[in-house]
Amino acid sequence: MDGRPDLGFVLMICGAVFDFFDGLAARLLKASSGIGKELDSLADMVSFGVLPSLMLFKLGNPSWGVLGYVPLLIAVFSALRLAKFNLDERQHQGFLGLPTPASAMICGSLSCHVHSTPGGLLSSWCAGPVFIPVLALVLCVLLVSEIPMFSMKFGGGNKASKADIFKRIAFLVLSAAGLAFVLLARLDWSIAVLICFTGYILVNLFSALLPTALSS
């Protein structure tokens, strides 16, 4: 991974694509099993726990001391998040806490952008000993939080609530606006991914602050 965070990010995206469709494929093939569920969690841990924590760790500087190791906590909290998801019966239609793929995409896209645009604004933020450790801690807290977050996967059978419909529409609008901005400004493609998943977090946080207005 040294010198090629872009390759690591592409592989992470491939993992996210497979993760998106694996449940659907299992249902269509009638191949669901307990072993498959555990292997799915193991694959998620590697792709969306270990890999993003190492990518964010590599953005740090040895001179930061103990702060430079804070990004490695993402792997630990991702494991807790996956274990919680497997045991929590409340998370069939959506999530409680930030899903590991979303956390991973933020880490991966940031690492890829800093690598391709060393003189950019985000690169200057990442050069100091504050931004990366704080980002890592925020992601760790969100991973194990109880904040309701909508799922991007299809299926489930139950009708979506007004809150979920609002969040999906807001997410699509923010993503479209972010993509348009990236294209017009001719920015690195990884910024589009970073904007989308930052928007995913912000939409869910905003809706959590307005439970009465958005309740079904």
Q: What are these model-derived regions, one by one?
A:
Residues 1-38, 66-75, 135-136, 193:
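Membrane-embedded alpha-helical segments that form the functional core of polytopic membrane enzymes
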Residues 1-7, 27-36, 58-66, 88-91, ...:
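Short juxtamembrane and helix-loop transition motifs at transmembrane-helix boundaries
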Residues 1-5, 10, 61-93, 98-100, ...:
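"…together with the soluble PPM/PP2C metallo-phosphatase catalytic core" -> "…together
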Residues 1-10, 46, 50-71, 109-131, ...:
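Helix-coil boundary and interhelical linker segments in multi-pass alpha-helical membrane proteins
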Residues 14, 52, 76-79, 83, ...:
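Alpha-helical transmembrane segments of polytopic integral membrane proteins
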Residues 22-33, 78-93, 97, 144-153, ...:
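C-terminal ends of transmembrane helices
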Residues 96-216:
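C-terminal membrane-associated helical module and adjoining short loops/tails
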